[in-house]
Amino acid sequence: MDIDIDDILAELDRDTTAVASSSGQHGFLDANSSMQHVTQTTAFDSSLPHANNLQKDYSPVTPEQDYLQLLKHWRNERCAPELLPLPKLLVSRMLKRIQDQMEHIENISMGFLEHEILEKDGEEAIGQNEYQNNALNNGKLPLLCMEAELERVKFVMRSYLRCRLNKIDKYSLYLRQLGDQGINLISLDELMSEQELKYHAKHSVILLKLLNNSILRHMPPELQAINDTEGSVSMIEEPNWKKFVFIYVNGPANVADDPQLQQSEDGKYYYNITIPEFDEIVELTTGSIYVMRYDIVKDLLRDGKVELI
């Protein structure tokens, strides 16, 4: 599924307010909710080789689990100084569920007056009005709850994508340098979606044209290099790797699967990290919170062993 940033932001801004609802009290994150037409999915695409064998070892991914994962990626993206890899499958599933829930709410609102408010032959006008008002009041509350819950999910998704776009704008030349030199641990294709790559390419071209037309072409040739890093101040703005961040140590679901995880004498599990400047080893105990420099824990963050808070 292609991830179109423009379509995402436009779709999430669309007004989904409806006037009424049926009597079912279901939410967006409930696996047995009114989204019965949205089946549970797994983290693997069945069209990939050996995907059927992989699916046997993994349980289905519920909407609630996906939402919690989205919250974790959202917090990490907002707290990290660099652009983190995009969880493409997770974002695709969440966008599909958001769209399906929006359509479901609209279907409920359009069919409510037809199916729930029935005119009774022979009733007096006052009694009929009371019946209709009670039906409206009883059916509107569940729909309002569904809409409020959907708006929370849309807010998180919208904030997550805009935070990523802001980092692409801020570190456009740095990301361009990583792509040209290939010095990054992961490729730009894994770091960004297809639409984010197109946005980054167009933004960097516009920025380079602006710098060249306004400043660089009026300077001596030896000073026109936009990627000059030989002076005291680099021409390319990089993320602040020395930034201090709060981390929560998750640890793996199965301690036997992580060779880096060690066990202390009192039975607690921890990770060893080294602070190069002091040649000091620090133990990060699972389930604990620490304040560390980002460059020290970024590898643990990418492996999912810690999360930013």
Curated annotation (Swiss-Prot):
Its main location: nucleus. GO terms for cellular component: CMG complex; GINS complex; nuclear replication fork. Pfam families: Sld5, SLD5_C. It is found in: Nucleus. Keywords: Chromosome partition, DNA replication, Nucleus. GO terms for biological process: chromosome segregation; DNA-templated DNA replication; double-strand break repair via break-induced replication. Gene3D superfamilies: 1.20.58.1030, 3.40.5.60. Signal peptide: none annotated. Component of the GINS complex which is a heterotetramer of SLD5, PSF1, PSF2 and PSF3. Belongs to the GINS4/SLD5 family. The GINS complex plays an essential role in the initiation of DNA replication. Has a role in chromosome segregation. This is DNA replication complex GINS protein SLD5. It comes from Candida glabrata (strain ATCC 2001 / BCRC 20586 / JCM 3761 / NBRC 0622 / NRRL Y-65 / CBS 138) (Yeast). The lineage of its organism: Eukaryota, Fungi, Dikarya, Ascomycota, Saccharomycotina.
